[in-house]
Amino acid sequence: MVVASAPAKPGSVGQQESASRDATASPWVTIVWDDPVNLMTYVTYVFQKLFGYSEPHATKLMLQVHNEGRAVVSAGSREAMEVDVSKLHAAGLWATMQQDR
């Protein structure tokens, strides 16, 4: 005997739990955007101090921001990325976060 459950109705608890699991399964990323204000050396310094990146890695990310207009500088939970974005804003950098799919 095979027992199958009915599909979840839109907005039902089963569907909401599934959407919630999908949202937490995909990591979030912090993106730093190029701006006309901050010097490249300062951006490298901020990456080293805030994230503990080595100078070569921080320089690589800074060059990606400079040349491509943006770079992903960290990934993790939504809450952790909110903290990273706040720290970058406090340092004067343009940063956003988005879910990485």
UniProtKB/Swiss-Prot annotation:
GO biological process, one term: proteolysis
Biased amino acid composition, Polar residues: 13-23
Disulphides: none
Domain of life: Bacteria
One Pfam family linked to the record: ClpS
Disordered as annotated region, ranges: 1-24
InterPro entries assigned to the protein according to its UniProt record, in alphabetical order: ClpS, ClpS_core, Ribosomal_bL12_C/ClpS-like
HAMAP family for the chain: ClpS
Quaternary organization: Binds to the N-terminal domain of the chaperone ClpA.
Entries under PANTHER family matching the protein: ATP-DEPENDENT CLP PROTEASE ADAPTER PROTEIN CLPS, ATP-DEPENDENT CLP PROTEASE ADAPTER PROTEIN CLPS1, CHLOROPLASTIC
Function summary: Involved in the modulation of the specificity of the ClpAP-mediated ATP-dependent protein degradation.
Family: Belongs to the ClpS family.
Official protein name in the record: ATP-dependent Clp protease adapter protein ClpS
Species this chain originates from: Mycobacterium marinum (strain ATCC BAA-535 / M)
